[in-house]
């Protein structure tokens, strides 16, 4: 079946979200707050581990770092572009529209839950590489593995942040479905260097999502999204 990985991933997010919404009703405000902070700490460590994996290497028995300047440039330029386009505002407006259309107008956490969950499950190399592999080879194995992770993540996030997290299935379906359909065009661009850059910058953004969950919303992470495109382009520049 074409785009099987994306279909399963979308259903996994919906399933995890429904389970989380039902279980979340049994939790009090204190438990929900603690669970949100816990999700944030986990996201921070996942982002940190992904960042260090791309930045650290062993040469001649010594640990060396690389990619620091690339990371700074990509995130700085990406942030400027994102702020000018106000991508965070676009996410929030779509979340507000969804909140009204789905009958959740009184849910004050809906938009934050939608934006945070969407960024968490969309950012990362697994979504891109898995979609390309599914489109070209018909092998959904990477996206199936991602589906298991996303099911757990969204179930936990929905418990603490509400039903808005369930609708993160929409951007996942759009992003991964689009990449799968365009996989033959995208594959030559996603070289090893491009994927490494994407993973580095994406991991930093996942860390930022965790920071927002732990210390309330302080970083407009969606406005950093152009940094991912810049990171991929940077892989083809002669420096």
What do these predicted regions represent?
Residues 31-41, 95-97, 165-175, 222-229:
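Cytoplasmic-side transmembrane-helix entry/capping segments in multi-pass membrane proteins
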Residues 99, 108-187:
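Helix-loop-helix junctions within the multi-pass membrane cores of secondary transporters/permeases
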Residues 49-54, 82-97, 210-219:
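Transmembrane helix exit motif
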């Amino acid at each position: 079946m074409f785009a099987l990985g994306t279909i399963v991933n979308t259903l996994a997010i919906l399933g995890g979200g429904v389970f989380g919404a039902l279980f979340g009703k049994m939790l009090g405000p204190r438990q929900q707050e603690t669970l949100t902070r816990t999700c944030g700490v986990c996201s921070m460590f996942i982002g940190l581990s992904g960042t260090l994996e791309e930045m650290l290497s062993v040469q001649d028995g010594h640990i060396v770092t690389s990619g620091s300047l690339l990371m700074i440039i990509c995130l700085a330029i990406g942030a400027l572009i994102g702020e000018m386009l106000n991508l965070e505002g676009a996410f929030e407006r779509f979340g507000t529209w969804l909140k009204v259309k789905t009958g959740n107008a009184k849910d004050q956490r809906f938009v934050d839950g939608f934006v945070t969950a969407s960024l968490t499950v969309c950012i990362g190399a697994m979504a891109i590489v898995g979609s390309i592999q599914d489109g070209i080879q018909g092998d959904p194995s990477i996206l199936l593995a991602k589906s298991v992770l996303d099911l757990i993540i969204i179930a936990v996030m929905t418990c603490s942040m509400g039903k808005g997290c369930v609708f993160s299935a929409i951007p996942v379906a759009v992003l991964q479905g689009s990449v799968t359909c365009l996989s033959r065009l995208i594959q030559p661009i996603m070289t090893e260097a491009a994927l490494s850059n994407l993973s580095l910058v994406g991991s930093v953004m996942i860390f930022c999502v965790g920071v927002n969950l732990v210390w309330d919303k302080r970083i407009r992470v969606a406005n950093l999204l152009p940094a991912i495109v810049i990171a991929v382009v940077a892989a083809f520049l002669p420096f």
